């Protein structure tokens, strides 16, 4: 009996059942990746997907961003009918495209169109990282180039919101061509006096960061956005140096003169309105960057 009294008792861990795991429906709550706070998704969306605890800027979908920036009922979408093909016959590429179309209810990784911001007419392009990580394929480049051309025709400012992992590898050189095509369209627009505003959001990397994302008359970014061409690990291995902790963040780029401002999401519409107001000519119909 004494032996039983001093013997170690076995410890057991309780494993939650599948039913217990499903008690909280998916999508009801969102955990902040920065401060780890768990909040109601509905409250997060109401706060423009900015964490109410630490201010972390969660990604926004293209429809959400358009909805919070443009005046209600003014948005008219361009080129929704343009769809990606598979020119290189890359295995399972079209299956993945179809999956993203079903998941996001979008046809491609960018939404373009026209509308007004506090009464100021603009042409806008908004990338959506949910669709193939916002990668730039031939349709993405074509939609952006066409949007720039429409901004030229209408003599209104062009605003682009970037969120991309870079060029779309499944389309090879056709994807890389979009860097030149979009950059050339922006150059022509700029030569005609057009106003270009670029807003880089998390993440803006690869061929997108090396082309149209960095060619604005104003280059803005959201707080904490990852912005860069090559990955941090690749750069460290190449230069054989340890990089700063904040390397490739919006704040790092601002500090080193590569951005004009880092603007919190709640202040973005007012900032864009002020910029548009400054650049509108006295006549009210023309825009200029001079």
Curated annotation (Swiss-Prot):
Lipid metabolism: present as a keyword of the record? yes
Could you list this entry's UniProt keywords, alphabetically sorted: ATP-binding, Cytoplasm, Fatty acid biosynthesis, Fatty acid metabolism, Lipid biosynthesis, Lipid metabolism, Metal-binding, Nucleotide-binding, Transferase, Zinc, Zinc-finger
Q: What biological-process terms (Gene Ontology) are attached? A: fatty acid biosynthetic process; malonyl-CoA biosynthetic process
- Required cofactor names: Zn(2+)
Binding site residues for Zn(2+): 32, 35, 51, 54
Its Enzyme Commission number?
A: 2.1.3.15
* Pfam families with a match to the protein in the record: Carboxyl_trans, Zn_ribbon_ACC
- Which GO CC terms are listed, alphabetically? acetyl-CoA carboxylase complex
What does the cofactor section's free text say about binding?
Answer: Binds 1 zinc ion per subunit.
Catalyzed reactions per annotation: N(6)-carboxybiotinyl-L-lysyl-[protein] + acetyl-CoA = N(6)-biotinyl-L-lysyl-[protein] + malonyl-CoA
The record ties this protein, via PROSITE patterns, to: COA_CT_NTER
| GO terms of molecular function | acetyl-CoA carboxylase activity; ATP binding; carboxyl- or carbamoyltransferase activity; zinc ion binding
Q: Which residues form a coiled coil?
A: none
Per UniProt, the C4-type Zn-finger stretches lie at 32-54
User: Which InterPro entries does the entry mention?
Assistant: AcCoA_carboxyl_beta (IPR034733), Acetyl_CoA_COase_Trfase_b_su (IPR000438), ClpP/crotonase-like_dom_sf (IPR029045), COA_CT_N (IPR011762), Znf-ACC (IPR041010)
Q: Where is the CoA carboxyltransferase N-terminal domain?
A: 28-290
Question: Which pathway does this polypeptide act in?
Answer: Lipid metabolism; malonyl-CoA biosynthesis; malonyl-CoA from acetyl-CoA: step 1/1
Where found, per UniProt?
A: Cytoplasm
Enzyme type, top EC level? transferase
UniProt similarity note: Belongs to the AccD/PCCB family.
Explain the purpose of this protein. Component of the acetyl coenzyme A carboxylase (ACC) complex. Biotin carboxylase (BC) catalyzes the carboxylation of biotin on its carrier protein (BCCP) and then the CO(2) group is transferred by the transcarboxylase to acetyl-CoA to form malonyl-CoA.
Task: State the oligomer form and interacting partners.
Answer: Acetyl-CoA carboxylase is a heterohexamer composed of biotin carboxyl carrier protein (AccB), biotin carboxylase (AccC) and two subunits each of ACCase subunit alpha (AccA) and ACCase subunit beta (AccD).
Protein name according to UniProt: Acetyl-coenzyme A carboxylase carboxyl transferase subunit beta
From which organism does this entry originate? Anoxybacillus flavithermus (strain DSM 21510 / WK1)
- Gene expressing this chain: accD
């Amino acid at each position: 009996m004494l032996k039983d009294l001093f013997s170690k008792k076995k410890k057991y861990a309780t494993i939650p059942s599948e039913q217990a795991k499903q008690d909280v429906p998916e999508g009801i709550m969102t955990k902040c990746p920065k401060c780890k706070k768990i909040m109601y998704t509905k409250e997060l969306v109401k706060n423009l997907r900015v964490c109410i605890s630490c201010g972390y800027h969660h990604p926004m979908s293209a429809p959400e961003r358009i909805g919070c920036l443009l005046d209600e009922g003014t948005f008219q979408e361009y080129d929704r009918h343009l769809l990606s093909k598979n020119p290189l016959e890359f295995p399972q590429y079209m299956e993945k495209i179809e999956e993203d179309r079903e998941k996001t209810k979008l046809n491609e990784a960018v939404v373009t169109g026209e509308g007004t911001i506090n009464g100021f007419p603009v042409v806008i392009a908004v990338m959506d990282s949910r669709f193939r990580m916002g990668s730039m394929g031939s349709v993405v480049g074509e939609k952006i180039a066409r949007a720039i051309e429409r901004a030229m025709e209408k003599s209104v400012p062009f605003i682009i919101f970037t969120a991309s992992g870079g060029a779309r590898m499944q389309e090879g050189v056709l994807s890389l061509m979009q860097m030149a095509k979009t950059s050339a369209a922006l150059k022509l627009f700029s030569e005609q006096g057009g106003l270009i505003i670029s807003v880089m959001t998390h993440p803006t990397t690869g061929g997108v960061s090396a082309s149209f994302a960095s060619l604005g008359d104003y280059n803005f970014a959201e707080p904490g956005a990852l912005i860069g061409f090559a990955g941090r690990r690749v750069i460290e291995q190449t230069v054989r140096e340890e990089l700063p902790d904040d390397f490739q963040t919006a704040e790092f780029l601002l500090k080193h003169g590569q951005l004009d401002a880092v603007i919190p999401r709640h202040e973005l519409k007012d900032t864009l309105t002020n910029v548009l107001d400054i650049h509108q000519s006295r006549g009210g119909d023309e825009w200029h960057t001079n």
